[in-house]
């Protein structure tokens, strides 16, 4: 203790020390209260809009639900009846095929980055491109596929939509797969190598098996991402008013149908649009909850 502090008046006075302690605690409590209040206000601000959106979707979407919604195709303008059967089936086809194509590519690329490439130049380039695709707006991907596929073919098609959606899903699967594989302890790899296990078998039987829950979570999050994408489909698959499973032609889908019906002046189309919004919201929420449940259980 310095001489100046020894000579300070009241430096050994218990009452003065207690008063100083109380003042310091009061300042800390005040700062903590301000920080906590601001945090709660920010959380409430976000939750209010989320709850409002969900409430509006539920209130307006449930009213449009009916058996005809799942059994009839989209109706002509200014007519009663009709449904979204063709758009629902079209969306399932587009998302399913995009997932079928994008999932194995994303997993294989993630395995390469985590187990083989690591710090090589090819891995660095792959990660850089993957980061760009992760942050790129979906409309940019749609325009890219339009110029690459639709303009060359001379017409819109379901396959172009599948290609665009797969490009949006692949980066998510790559990032998730790489991160999950990196979480596997190196001791497991070293133990497998010590037993003479080839690297490909070690990856297949140990690291992939240990991280399968995280990879499945990434795939489900990728599906949830592309399920409601509208912009890329406007430039690729477009839509139609009929029930068609011909992927070489424009394919009806929920996002574009919702966009078209919501912008129309017809009450029946607007009701179907809200019903479609409710279905997509329900599907995306369900996929996110399922992904979190699978990951937390593992």
Task: Describe the function of each predicted region.
Residues 1-45, 291-298:
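Transmembrane alpha-helical segments of polytopic membrane transport and secretion proteins
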Residues 118-123, 127, 185, 189-217:
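Amphipathic cytosolic juxtamembrane alpha-helices at the membrane-cytosol interface
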Residues 130-169:
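Generic hydrophobic transmembrane alpha-helix motif, especially the helices
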Residues 99, 176-177, 199-235:
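Transmembrane alpha-helices
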């Amino acid at each position: 203790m310095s001489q100046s502090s020894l000579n300070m008046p009241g430096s050994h006075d218990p009452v003065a020390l207690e008063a100083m302690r109380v003042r310091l605690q009061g300042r800390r409590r005040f700062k903590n209260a301000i920080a906590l209040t601001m945090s709660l206000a920010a959380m409430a601000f976000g939750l209010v809009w989320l709850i409002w959106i969900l409430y509006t979707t539920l209130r307006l979407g449930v009213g449009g639900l009916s058996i005809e919604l799942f059994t009839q195709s989209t109706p002509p303008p200014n007519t009663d009846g009709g449904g979204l059967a063709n758009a629902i089936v079209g969306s399932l086809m587009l998302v399913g095929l995009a997932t079928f194509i994008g999932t194995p590519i994303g997993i294989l690329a993630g395995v390469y980055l985590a187990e083989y490439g690591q710090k090589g130049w090819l891995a660095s380039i792959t990660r850089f491109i993957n980061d760009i695709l992760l942050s790129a707006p979906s409309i940019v991907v749609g325009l890219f596929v339009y110029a690459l596929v639709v303009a060359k073919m001379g017409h819109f098609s379901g396959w172009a939509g599948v290609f665009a959606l797969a490009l949006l899903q692949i980066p998510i699967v790559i990032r998730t797969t790489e991160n999950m594989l990196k979480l596997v302890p190196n001791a497991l790899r070293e133990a497998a190598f010590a037993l003479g296990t080839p690297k490909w078998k070690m990856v297949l039987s140990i690291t992939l098996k240990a991280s399968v829950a995280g990879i499945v979570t990434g795939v489900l999050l990728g599906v949830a991402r592309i399920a409601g994408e509208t912009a890329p489909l406007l430039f690729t698959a477009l839509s139609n008013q009929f029930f068609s499973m011909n992927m070489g032609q424009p394919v009806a889908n929920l996002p574009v149908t919702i966009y078209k019906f919501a912008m129309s002046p017809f009450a029946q189309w607007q009701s179907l649009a809200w019903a479609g919004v409710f279905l997509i919201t329900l599907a995306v929420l369900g996929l996110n909850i399922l992904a979190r449940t699978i990951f937390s259980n593992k």
